Every structure is written in C-alpha cells, then in structure tokens.
Amino acid sequence: MANPPHGGVLKDLLARDAPRHDELEMEAEKLPAIVLTERQLCDLELIMNGGFSPLEGFMNQKDYDSVCENVRLADGNLFSMPITLDVSQAVIDEGKLKPGSRVTLRDFRDDRNLAILTIDDIYRPDKAKEAKLVFGGDEEHPAIKYLYNKVQEFYVGGKIEAINKLNHYDYVALRYTPAELRVHFDKLGWNRVVAFQTRNPMHRAHRELTVRAARARQANVLIHPVVGLTKPGDIDHFTRVRAYQALLPRYPNGMAVLGLLGLAMRMGGPREAIWHAIIRKNHGATHFIVGRDHAGPGKNSKGQEFYGPYDAQHAVEKYREELGIEVVEFQQVTYLPDTDEYKPKDEVPPGVKTLDISGTELRNRLRTGAPIPEWFSYPEVVKILRESSPPRHTQGFTIFLTGYMNSGKDAIARALQVTLNQQGGRSVSLLLGDTVRHELSSELGFSREDRHTNIQRIAFVAGELTRAGAAVIASPIAPYEESRNAARDAVTQAGGNFFLVHVATPLEYCEKTDKRGIYAKARRGEIKGFTGVDDPYETPSKADLTVDVSKQTVRSIVHEIILMLETEGFFDRS
C-alpha cells in the first residue's frame, strides 16, 4: 500500500473540481487574468495535482511568513519552501485585484485558462528575509538572484479551483500525477518504493546505488527526475529522458519504473531536500534517497560551496518523524577496477585502487570526443549524450565585442567575419551595432532601459544562431555590465558558447579619430545620452579578451581572437 500523502489527504484539485469544469471555464472567461510564468506554471501544476499537498493554492502571508521562519505552514504542517504567486503593481492595477476578488490563472504558452484563484491577500514580501532564511543569504545563489532580479514586488495568496491540466507534448505517458503513480504502484503490487531524485544523466554508479538501496529495504525503485526548471547549464531534459529510458533495461526485471516530475527547482539545499521528500511522499514513495550536497547549486565565485556536503541529510533527519518517509542517506559510490565493482566510498578498504570521473571531466570528454569507459557508463547512454553534445569544433559560438563608439569594434567584426568564412566549417553571422539598431530596434531610444532591451534582442538572436552551430559576431557599444552579463547568460543558457571581447580603445583616441564628427555633436549637446560624453561606459570586469586599436592593428587583434578560439577547441585539429 502506498505511503499516505503529506497532511493525510492528497489534494488532487483537478479531480475535486472536475464536476464543475464547464461552470468554472465560463466564469474564467469573464474574470481578469494573471498570465503565469514558466516557474509559476510548474508550481501551479503540482498544486493542482496534489504534488504539493497539503497546499490548495499559493501561500498567503501567514503561511509564507511561517514557512520562511518556522519551516511549516501556519496550521503546523511541515513545509519548507515558499510557494508564492508574484505579480507587479501593473497587474494588480489592471485587474483591480484585491482580497476577496477572483482571478483567472492563464498559461502563457497557449492562453488556456488553468484555474481560478480566490484572493486571500496581496502582500509585499520581505525578500531579504526570504533570501536569508530559505536559501542562506549568499547573493550569488541562483535562487536569490532570481528572487531579486526576476520576482515581482507583490505576492498574491489564495486557494485555487482547478479547470484544466497543463498541456504537455513530450513524454506524456511518463508524466504521472501523484494519484496516477499510486494506482500504478498498486497495479504492480509494490508496497515499498525508493524514490531517486536527479537533474543529471544517470550512469553506472547511480544504477548501483539505487539497486543497493532497494535491495537493502526489499523495495522497488522510482526514478523520478526533474523535467521542469533546473540549474542553468544543465543537460536538457529531452536528452536526459532518452538516457534514463536507455538505462532502465539495465535494472533487474521489474525493479524500477521511470516517472517525470515537472518541478521548478530552487537549488535550495537543506530546505529543498525536505521539500523533495514531501513531494515524493505525495507520489506514494515510502523511501527517498538524499545524497551529498542534495539540490545544492555548486560553488560561488570564491570557490565556496553554498551548503555543507551533508547539510541536506542533517535537515531531513531532523524532521524524519514528521516527514513520514524514510530517508536513505548514501555516500558516493566509487569503482574498484581490480574487482570490477562499485562500492560506497566508506566501505572501501585503505589502499584499494578506485576510479572516478567527475562531472567536469565527463563534459570535457564529451566536448573533445575522448573515450568514456564502460565501467563509468553504459554504451547506449554514452551514445545518447554524444548525440546531444557534439565535439567543440562543430559547436557554435558568439564573439561579443564591446567598447566606445569608433573604438574599432566594427572593423574587427568585419575582418573576423572574413577570417572565419575563410576558415570554413560553420556559417558566420554579423550583428553590427548600427545594423541591429536599424533592423531590430528602430523604435528604441538610448535610455538605460532601451539600451538594455537592445542588448537582450542581440543576445536572443545570437543564442538561437549559436545553438544551431553558427559563429556570431556582435559589436554593440553595450556600456552596462548588467546588460553584458545578461547577454552572456542568454547565450550560454541557449546552449551556446560566449566570449566577451573588450575593445578598450581609449575615449580620447576614439574621439580624435572620429571622422563623422559624432563626438563633436555630443560635446555641443546636439546628441543626448552619448556613451563617454554624458552617459558612462562601465568597464567589463570579466572580459575573455581585452584589445586596443590605438596600440594594435585590426589584423593582430583578429589573430588573437582566432588563437583564443583555437585554444578552446573550436577548430578541427584532425
């Protein structure tokens, strides 16, 4: 029999509200609407299907404060992660939202009405408190960056009436709701289920540790990977799911099933581990594996871990009785070549030879085409990963040139385009500052906001082209550090490679060699908001290459860029 849900009752709002579907659908058309973001959609789906039981909506201020401060809802139920609906003042004003009013929650992807929320309260969160208490306070933490840079200024709390499930077009048969997974376990006759959470591909070590956990508890295995939002830079879920499917036959017959979880991870370490355990309990699991640095985001810029390696295990152990799911703590397993087996590291006798491949080394082997041994991963899994991780010399990249007007950016860009075309092997696209302004951003001015929007557009185009294997050369002024960092993030998150080249030609030289007289017009006040005259240029703090046309020729600068690309493996050396 499956584990009882958290709070005692599975809050399957879709099943509960199905008899009123037509009535709610008609009402939703007449109400103001909040169009949900991707993260909000992930949260809503798990509220509606019971994955976040005992929640029945987005948290009001009482629950939010209690979760942040006490790791439990206002009614006393253990819950570790704030589940909130953030909105802007403009949305509140447009919808005339207030406590007691009803509002439709709508999918941004297809404009479908998903639910109606009855507003309990609208409140301004204490983001500093949330950042400190929930995530630890390090401003480099991805969830804290998201909180400060993406989350709107107000939260809307209230209960939900469900109308429609989210539409998915990928791996539909594997997207079990908690109720469906519980029925599936009953059909299979499974009474004890060990759930395994992952956002990465699985290899032999993962297979070994899950089988060990199941055998020790006379249980079966639920492979339950996250396919919602994970950490930027993670391998896409399409590739991962194909790899999980390829791995499944390697388990003893009938031992494991694969189900997908559309969760938006926060990378919240100890808090997230508790949350993950609650979610798996709601899906019917009786046991949950928590490993080293569970759901941690890695290291900050100083090379420091955001959380201790076993903080997550300590957190779930602290609340073990309340969680109502047995937590399986595991040590990292390692390969013993002399006996061709895997063992937990704490069980390996001193002096015995072991082998491991780190995630960084694996990515490097995929990038370079170096062999990946069978003791580490199965050939069918490696084949899938290689298909989605082509060698570096076939990948696209973006060269992002930034500097003052007339610093030589465009001359470098044109010369680099010719050189790369001569090199061959990939298409080359040129995004000159003036061309982009004319073709993509003609309606924009030169305010800080408009400049940022212009760079966002360049980054979007560059990311799409780079992902498709093209070489992109962009040469906007891009005076602001925030915009340049956002451009780097956009391209890398699209799966591309990004190089920032600071064309650090001094302002005096740019002005002296300005044959068009644009600087002179700016000095006379005929042009406002001109970079270097009455608007600042923020020197890049993390340029991949710094060049100067007042001291170097364009030819030598292009050669430096080519050498940088060659060193990084972007040209075929065979």
UniProtKB/Swiss-Prot annotation:
Complex formation: Homohexamer. Dimer of trimers.
Subcellular location: Cytoplasm
InterPro entries: APS_kinase, ATP-Sase_PUA-like_dom, P-loop_NTPase, PUA-like_sf, Rossmann-like_a/b/a_fold, Sulf_adenylyltr_euk, Sulf_AdTrans/APS_kinase, Sulfurylase_cat_dom
Site (Induces change in substrate recognition on ATP binding): F330
One GO molecular-function entry: ATP binding
Binding positions for ATP per the UniProt entry: Q197, T198, R199, N200, G291, R292, D293, H294, V333
Pfam name, any one: PUA_2
Encoding gene per record: met3
PANTHER family: SULFATE ADENYLYLTRANSFERASE
Record-annotated active site: T198, R199, N200
A Gene Ontology cellular-component term: cytoplasm
Pathway: Sulfur metabolism; hydrogen sulfide biosynthesis; sulfite from sulfate: step 1/3
Protein name (record): Sulfate adenylyltransferase
Source organism, top-level taxon: Eukaryota
Enzyme class, UniProt record, top EC level: transferase
Cross-referenced HAMAP family: Sulf_adenylyltr_euk
Keyword list, A-Z: Allosteric enzyme, Amino-acid biosynthesis, ATP-binding, Cysteine biosynthesis, Cytoplasm, Methionine biosynthesis, Nucleotide-binding, Nucleotidyltransferase, Transferase
Principal cellular location given in the protein's record: cytoplasm
Binding-site list for 3'-phosphoadenylyl sulfate: D434, T435, V436, R437, R451, I477, A478, R516
Domain text: The adenylyl-sulfate kinase (APS kinase) is non-functional. It is involved in allosteric regulation by PAPS. PAPS binding induces a large rotational rearrangement of domains lowering the substrate affinity of the enzyme.
GO biological process: cysteine biosynthetic process; hydrogen sulfide biosynthetic process; methionine biosynthetic process; sulfate assimilation, phosphoadenylyl sulfate reduction by phosphoadenylyl-sulfate reductase (thioredoxin)
Family, similarity comment: In the N-terminal section; belongs to the sulfate adenylyltransferase family.
Organism classification: Eukaryota, Fungi, Dikarya, Ascomycota, Pezizomycotina
Organism (species): Aspergillus fumigatus (strain ATCC MYA-4609 / CBS 101355 / FGSC A1100 / Af293) (Neosartorya fumigata)
Gene3D superfamilies: HUPs (3.40.50.620), P-loop containing nucleotide triphosphate hydrolases (3.40.50.300), Sulfate adenylyltransferase (3.10.400.10)
Catalyzed reaction equations: sulfate + ATP + H(+) = adenosine 5'-phosphosulfate + diphosphate
Residues reported in the UniProt entry to bind sulfate: Q197, R199, A295
Region (N-terminal): 1-169
Activity control note: Allosterically inhibited by 3'-phosphoadenosine 5'-phosphosulfate (PAPS).
